[in-house]
Curated annotation (Swiss-Prot):
Belongs to the class-II aminoacyl-tRNA synthetase family. This is Histidine--tRNA ligase. The gene is hisS. Its EC number is 6.1.1.21. One of its GO terms (molecular function) is catalytic activity, acting on a protein. It is an enzyme of class 6 (ligase).
Length: 426
């Protein structure tokens, strides 16, 4: 019997959850500045939603998806990424309709699932923040979305982030490059890893994405996709680069970057940082102008990105960034005797309803243990409430640092705690 969490998952306990909540709140605030609204899609989708969009030959579909047949014999998969479900929702809910303001800007935050070998920053259930922008082919959309991710990293204080940029061009450009890559790699097929030998037949661009040493060696002198861009694709990419420079966002061109999903065209990008000497991708995305059409909607340009929360938080920790998380409690009530139990509950509830954080003792402990709890909670104020205080209708509240104290009536506590707090903490 297994009564532990499944391999590749984690429990996020309150101290850590506060960090998660902070990063999520900064992301929400940043996205709202760019007029993005939140979308929430199911954690599981029909298998075809993912296989059609991500690509039947990708590692995600062939190796990593959690898929099963439900009791109605429907082929279901836990979502391995966020874009396909959002595109499905965009089409199903007819967000392409003329009355819907364009571009449609959406963001999501949630769990994704992939059956991978668990390692630092990579779990089988992982959490992703992502954005999708529908309806604008303008290269300024590409740059605005990239700039939004860059803005988020700045707000979080993340340093040493490098933007890696490439273009996959139009479908025609990509097709021409695909053939050139096949011609280049076929003579050295036996030098490739087993996975890349398969990729050469199914999706040769994925060989460029391989992390295997023999594959990296094989593609060192591979032709560049930028040499196969048609005139329109070149113009789009040049505009993207010019606008990034206008916004003072530095970048490097990475012609071996192809992204692991089949739906991309034109601009693709990754933000990479160094963690303990190793490069780590913390955000990636690009343009996908055919995906809405794959789902039965009208041809609609799209651009988006996803970033892993686990990786982002790991980078924040490794870079020694202190997140401004409020951990102090406003007031702690030490309770002495059964006769004070009911009044303590009444007072602590009244204080909370005035907007303050408050806790009280429920365990009937000795006063010294209760004061220790107040220190653990970093309580700014401490009040001791016993039967004599209940009879008198008032109690002493003290500043837990300066030890300054004041005697206050219960009526004042229940109606005007802000003044009491200000008097003791100023």
């Amino acid at each position: 019997m297994k009564l532990q969490k499944p391999k590749g998952t984690q429990d996020i306990l309150p101290g850590d959850a506060a960090k998660w909540q902070y990063v999520e709140s900064v992301a929400r605030d940043t996205f709202s500045q760019y007029n993005y609204g939140e979308i929430r899609t199911p954690m599981f989708e029909h298998y075809e939603v993912i296989s059609r969009s991500v690509g039947d030959t990708t590692d995600i579909v062939t190796k990593e998806m959690y898929d099963f047949y439900d009791k109605g014999d429907r082929h279901i998969t836990l979502r391995p990424e966020g874009t396909a479900p959002v595109v499905r929702s965009y089409v199903e809910n007819k967000l392409f309709a003329p009355e819907v303001q364009k571009p449609v800007k959406l963001y999501y935050i949630g769990s994704m699932f992939r059956y991978e070998r668990p390692q630092a920053g990579r779990l089988r259930e992982f959490h992703q923040i992502g954005v999708e922008c529908f309806g604008a082919a303008n290269p300024a959309t590409d740059v605005e979305t990239i700039a939004m991710a860059y803005h988020l990293f700045e707000k979080l204080g993340i340093k040493d982030v490098t933007l890696h940029l490439n273009s996959l061009g139009s479908p025609e450009s990509r097709s021409a490059y695909r053939q050139a890559l096949i011609d280049y790699l076929t003579p050295m097929r036996d030098q490739l890893s087993k996975d890349s030998q398969r990729r050469l037949d199914e999706n040769p661009l994925r060989v460029l994405d391989s992390k295997e040493k023999e594959d990296k060696l094989a593609v060192e002198k591979a032709p560049s996709i930028l040499d196969y861009l048609d005139e329109e694709s070149q113009a789009h990419f040049e505009a993207v680069k010019a606008m990034l420079e206008a916004l003072d966002i530095p970048y490097v061109i990475d012609t071996n970057m192809v992204r692991g999903l089949d739906y991309y065209n034109h601009t693709i990008f990754e933000f990479i940082t160094s963690v303990e000497g190793s490069d780590l991708t913390i955000c990636a995305g690009g343009r996908y102008d055919s995906l809405v059409g794959y789902f039965g909607g009208p041809e609609t340009p799209g651009f988006g990105f996803g970033l892993g929360l686990e990786r982002l938080l790991m980078v924040i920790e490794k870079q020694g960034i202190t997140l401004p998380i409020e951990t102090e409690m406003d007031v702690y009530l030490a309770v002495l005797g059964d006769g004070a139990n009911s009044k303590a509950l009444e007072l602590v509830q009244a204080i909370r309803r005035q907007g303050f954080t408050a806790e009280r003792d429920y365990l009937g402990r000795k006063i010294k243990a209760q004061f220790k709890s107040a220190d653990t909670f970093k309580a700014k104020l401490v009040m001791t409430l016993g039967e004599s205080e209940v009879e008198a209708g008032k109690a002493v509240i003290k500043n837990n640092r300066s030890r300054q104290e004041v005697e206050v009536s219960f009526e004042d506590m229940m109606t005007n705690f802000a003044n009491i707090s200000e008097q003791l903490l100023s």
